[in-house]
A protein has these predicted regions:
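Non-globular, low-confidence helical/coil segments that flank catalytic cores
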Residues: 2-269
């Protein structure tokens, strides 16, 4: 019987939402849980009333269910400590979770023990978008681990890669690293899109616009085609530059100045 019960539990745990990812609940919800639990125990011992038992049980289930809902009143940005590397997570008040890069060359298993642990701490069971600037280890090796950790309690929606022209490759290593990344994503069944300058996504007040690379950009290294994203949320803006180098920065400045000129603005960078 115990063996059958174990196998049944193991089987059911693979279904989506079979496991509730609560994250770390706030003090008020922890207090509410214990308050209901104590009232239930006291009512059961003193009153021995089945109706009160039933009411307390329903309240306890409601409290436990509510533990998994973390409401953000504003956008939250977390710059994770990954050592020599980069990993930034954004949570919007609409409930979108976005990751910009995730890797390190100074910390081992940064995906499992830093990024994934942080997401579980926040009660996040899915990343809507993962923006990868370029496939260098200090920006992507943690994402490989996140892909391996995908299960019924965690999933990755869409991965955004820089839209580079393969025919323009000068450094073979840069091309090989990108091909490896694409193959891993394809085998994992994760949706992949490519962003060129001007492409954007928007959700409520939150938007991400690709500033680089331009379509057909001739790159010389992985850093050279590093995607640059402009994140905007209301009056707040943040430029995610990855490892963009001087050539890429010059290209972005020229594009911005050209657009400003077309719009009749006198501002120059």
């Amino acid at each position: 019987i115990l063996d059958f019960y174990y196998k049944l539990c193991s089987l059911s745990s693979h279904f989506k939402y079979a496991v509730i990812v609560t994250g770390i609940p706030d003090t008020a919800r922890v207090f509410l849980y214990y308050a209901v639990l104590i009232i239930w125990i006291c009512a059961h011992i003193i009153l021995i009333n089945k109706k009160i038992d039933a009411v307390c049980f329903v309240l306890l289930v409601c409290v436990l269910t509510g533990l998994r809902y973390n409401i953000n009143s504003d956008m939250k940005i977390a710059m994770l400590d990954v050592g020599q590397g980069d990993s930034i997570v954004m949570h919007t008040k609409e409930g979108m979770n976005v990751l910009f890069d995730g890797g390190s060359t100074s910390k081992k298993n940064v995906g499992r023990y830093t990024i994934y642990t942080y997401l579980k701490y926040c009660g996040v069971r899915s990343l809507d978008y993962v923006f990868i600037s370029h496939p260098d280890k200090d920006h992507v090796n943690g994402i490989y681990e996140l892909i391996e950790l995908c299960d019924n309690t965690f999933e990755i929606g869409t991965v955004v890669l820089p839209g580079i022209s393969r025919a323009a490759a000068v450094k073979k290593q840069a091309d090989d690293d990108m091909s490896k990344l694409e193959m891993i994503l394809k085998n994992a069944g994760i949706n992949v899109v490519y962003a060129d300058a001007g492409d954007s996504i928007k959700s409520g007040e939150f938007s991400v616009e690709c500033m680089h690379p331009c379509k057909g950009y001739n790159y010389e290294s992985a850093n050279d085609y590093s995607a640059v994203y402009l994140v905007e949320y209301g009056d707040f803006s943040m430029l995610m530059t990855g490892d963009a180098e001087k050539k890429a920065e010059k290209c972005i400045v020229e594009d911005v100045n050209r657009i400003a000129g077309d719009a009749g603005e006198s501002v120059r960078f």
